[in-house]
C-alpha cells in the first residue's frame, strides 16, 4: 500500500554535465502522452516525461540519437548535434499511433488464427530467454505516488484517529517517492536490487525496512508464474488458461512485431487480460499491457523492451494499482526506467534455436 507516482514530477536526467534538451511528447491530436520514454541510444541512458508529457534531459557535447517511445505508438528517432555553444534546445515531439496490418496467414492445410503459432513459438522460447544471459547490471530509476483514497466508517471509528496521529496516514494525502536501485543478475536466477538513493514522504507505517522501492525489475514474464501464483501468458500450460487472438503486425527496423490479444478462459481464476507484442524470429517480448483483478486488487502493468547485444531487455515499467483491503481504499502508480545496462551473453545461447513446429491438422 506504499509508493507511487507523483503527477507533476521532475524528469529523470542523465547524470552528466551538458546542455539541456526539453520539450513535450504529444499524439497527433495534440494531447500530451504521459510518462513517455526518451532514450539516448549511444549513451545507453534515458529519461521519462512527466504526466503532462514534458521532459528535460542533459546531453553532453557530441552527436546523439534520441528515440521517443510510448506504448501503442510508433517510436520516433531523431538525431541531434550538441555543441559547446549550444544552449537549451526545445523539441515538440508527435508520436503516431502504431498501425498494425492484419494479414491472413495459413498454417498447415487449414486456416487458423496466427496467434496460435506465434504463442507456441513464444512459449517454446521462454526457457531459452531465461538462460541467454550469464549476468547483467543496470540502474533502475523509480518514481511513484499514491494515496489512501477512502476508509470505511467502521475502520475510521476504530483506528482512523490513531492512524493519523501515530502513523501519519491520512485519507486524501499524496505520498511520493523517488529513488535509484542498482540491479544485478547472475545465472541461473540470482537477481538483487540495492537501494542507492531514496527520497520519500511515506509515513513510517508504509515503509518496508526503509527500502520502499518496489522490485518490479524482478518480474519476469518468461517465468511460468508471476507475482507468486498468476499464470503467465508464456507458461507451458498457457493454452489451458488463455485464448489468443492475432491483432496484426508492423515492421520496426526490419523486424516484424506481432500484436496478440490475451483473454482468460475463466473469470474465476487470477489471470491476465490485455495485449502482448512479440518480436518474430527471436520470439522475444517487445511490449505488453496486461491487467488482472481480484477481490482486493485492480492492477495494470505495462512493459517496453529494447535490444541490447541482440537480447531484448526491459527499459520501462508502468504499474497502476487500486487496492481495497479491510475497509481501506488506496491507489498508486509506479514508473521504473532501466538504464546503463551492462550485459554478458551466455555463449552457449548466442545462436537462437530453430523452432520446428509439428502438428497434425484435423
Where in this protein do the model-derived segments appear?
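Structured interaction patches on ligand/partner-binding surfaces of diverse proteins
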Residues: 47-48, 74-90
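A short, solvent-exposed loop/turn motif at the edges and junctions
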Residues: 40-42, 67-79
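Short Pro-Gly-centered beta-turn/loop motif in secreted/extracellular proteins
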Residues: 30-34, 56-63
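Short, acidic Ser/Thr/Gly-rich low-complexity loop/linker segments typical of extracellular
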Residues: 43-54
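Structural motif
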Residues: 19-33
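Conserved "repeat-terminator" motif of extracellular CCP/Sushi domains
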Residues: 90-101, 105-110
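Structured extracytoplasmic
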Residues: 104-259, 265-271, 335-362
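Hydrophobic beta-strand segments
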Residues: 36-40, 66, 107, 138
Amino acid at each position: 500500500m506504499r509508493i507511487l507516482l507523483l503527477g507533476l514530477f521532475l524528469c529523470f536526467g542523465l547524470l552528466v554535465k551538458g546542455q539541456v534538451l526539453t520539450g513535450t511528447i504529444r499524439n497527433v491530436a495534440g494531447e500530451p502522452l504521459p510518462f513517455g520514454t526518451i532514450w539516448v541510444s549511444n549513451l545507453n541512458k534515458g529519461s521519462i516525461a512527466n504526466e503532462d508529457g514534458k521532459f528535460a534531459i542533459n546531453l553532453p557535447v557530441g552527436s546523439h540519437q534520441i528515440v521517443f517511445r510510448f506504448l501503442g505508438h510508433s517510436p520516433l528517432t531523431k538525431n541531434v548535434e550538441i555543441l559547446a555553444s549550444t544552449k537549451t534546445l526545445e523539441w515538440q515531439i508527435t508520436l503516431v499511433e502504431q498501425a498494425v496490418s492484419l494479414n491472413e496467414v495459413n498454417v498447415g492445410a487449414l486456416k487458423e488464427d496466427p496467434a496460435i503459432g506465434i504463442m507456441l513459438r513464444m512459449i517454446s522460447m521462454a526457457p531459452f530467454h531465461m538462460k541467454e544471459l550469464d549476468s547483467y547490471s543496470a540502474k533502475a530509476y523509480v518514481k511513484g505516488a499514491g494515496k489512501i483514497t477512502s476508509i470505511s466508517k467502521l475502520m475510521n471509528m476504530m483506528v482512523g484517529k490513531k492512524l493519523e496521529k501515530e502513523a501519519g496516514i491520512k485519507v486524501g494525502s499524496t505520498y511520493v517517492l523517488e529513488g535509484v536501485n542498482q540491479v544485478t543478475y547472475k545465472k541461473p536466477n540470482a537477481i538483487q536490487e540495492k537501494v542507492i538513493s531514496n527520497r520519500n514522504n511515506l509515513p513510517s507505517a508504509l515503509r518496508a525496512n526503509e527500502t520502499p522501492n518496489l522490485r518490479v525489475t524482478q518480474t519476469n514474464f518468461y517465468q511460468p508464474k508471476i507475482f507468486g501464483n498468476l499464470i503467465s501468458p508464456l507458461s507451458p500450460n498457457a493454452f489451458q488458461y488463455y485464448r489468443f487472438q492475432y491483432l496484426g503486425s508492423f515492421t520496426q527496423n526490419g523486424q516484424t512485431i506481432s500484436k496478440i490479444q490475451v483473454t482468460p478462459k475463466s473469470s474465476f481464476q487470477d489471470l491476465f487480460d490485455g495485449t502482448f507484442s512479440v518480436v518474430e524470429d527471436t520470439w522475444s517480448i517487445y511490449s505488453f499491457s496486461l491487467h488482472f483483478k481480484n477481490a482486493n486488487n485492480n492492477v495494470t502493468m505495462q512493459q517496453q523492451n529494447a535490444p541490447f547485444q541482440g537480447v531484448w531487455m526491459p527499459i520501462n515499467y508502468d504499474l497502476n494499482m487500486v487496492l481495497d483491503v479491510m475497509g481501506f481504499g488506496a491507489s498508486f502508480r509506479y514508473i521504473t526506467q532501466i538504464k546503463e545496462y551492462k550485459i554478458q551473453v551466455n555463449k552457449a545461447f548466442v545462436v537462437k534455436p530453430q523452432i520446428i513446429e509439428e502438428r497434425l491438422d484435423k
